[in-house]
Amino acid sequence: MKVAVLGAAGGIGQALALLLKTQLPSGSELSLYDIAPVTPGVAVDLSHIPTDVKIKGFSGEDATPALEGADVVLISAGVARKPGMDRSDLFNVNAGIVKNLVQQIAKTCPQACIGIITNPVNTTVAIAAEVLKKAGVYDKNKLFGVTTLDIIRSNTFVAELKGKSATEVEVPVIGGHSGVTILPLLSQIPGVSFSDQEIADLTKRIQNAGTEVVEAKAGGGSATLSMGQAAARFGLSLVRAMQGEKGVVECAYVEGDGHYARFFSQPLLLGKNGVEERQSIGKLSAFEQQALEGMLDTLKKDIALGEDFVNK
């Protein structure tokens, strides 16, 4: 199993690469790519960690050597948020980066499962889909927007509030991956109940958690370490499922039946070829139903922005 990380010299990429080097199954290969000249050195640095995961780093304009034979590609390349920016301010720079990298994937490893981490995910996933479609290699079961950070944040905040162990809380999060499009299904956590005020406050905190980190880092970056952990969790789940493990479920942002929007984050049963089954979002509370209906316009606009970027 070969996993490629594109954008591997950045804050998310380095954290992700470290976690994959220590946690991928023995015999896996890890390839790191970034435009930055330091990238081969990041791979050398990580190669000294004693695990049975082969690692190689590549830099420059051409990602092809890193992509050859890749089964999974995780894209974290792009610029990070600064205070005062929202994820959509990143669009102007990151849209072009994602388009370029996905064009290279379409040529070099069109069969690979692709996880998009680069924000704004609501839009960059639509860009990737259109690029793959133009190249004639699009498989909607193999393209994911990685929303796992919303899930791990939800798990952490709920556990803190309710005095539970964070490892035993699992909150499904649906919708998209920015602001109001992030919808944690707090009504679906077994054995935990909330007041209306707690639900309103928690939902808002989860939606704004990225901004919390950007502000706390005071201009020095955005959520890189927790995002690295979230991306590793998703990537490792995908690898386990592709290697035949049964019952692996993760929420991610994928193209579905279009019932709510063309792309939508929901629980997915993962399998050998990516998405095996798009699972139901279950029964929503009145609050969740209202939040879902209220976000769809925003989500659809985000998606259209990505489609238009490729097709204009």
Curated annotation (Swiss-Prot):
It catalyses: (S)-malate + NAD(+) = oxaloacetate + NADH + H(+). NAD(+) binds at G7, A8, A9, G10, G11, I12, G13, D34, N94, I117, T118, N119, M227. Pfam families: Ldh_1_C, Ldh_1_N. GO terms for molecular function: L-malate dehydrogenase (NAD+) activity. One of its GO terms (cellular component) is cytoplasm. It is an enzyme of class 1 (oxidoreductase). One of its GO terms (biological process) is tricarboxylic acid cycle. Signal peptide: none annotated. Its EC number is 1.1.1.37. Keywords: NAD, Oxidoreductase, Tricarboxylic acid cycle. The active site is at H177 (proton acceptor). SUPFAM superfamilies: LDH C-terminal domain-like (SSF56327), NAD(P)-binding Rossmann-fold domains (SSF51735). Substrate binds at R81, R87, N119, R153. Catalyzes the reversible oxidation of malate to oxaloacetate. Belongs to the LDH/MDH superfamily. MDH type 1 family. Homodimer. PANTHER family: MALATE AND LACTATE DEHYDROGENASE, MALATE DEHYDROGENASE, MITOCHONDRIAL. This is Malate dehydrogenase. It comes from Klebsiella pneumoniae subsp. pneumoniae (strain ATCC 700721 / MGH 78578).
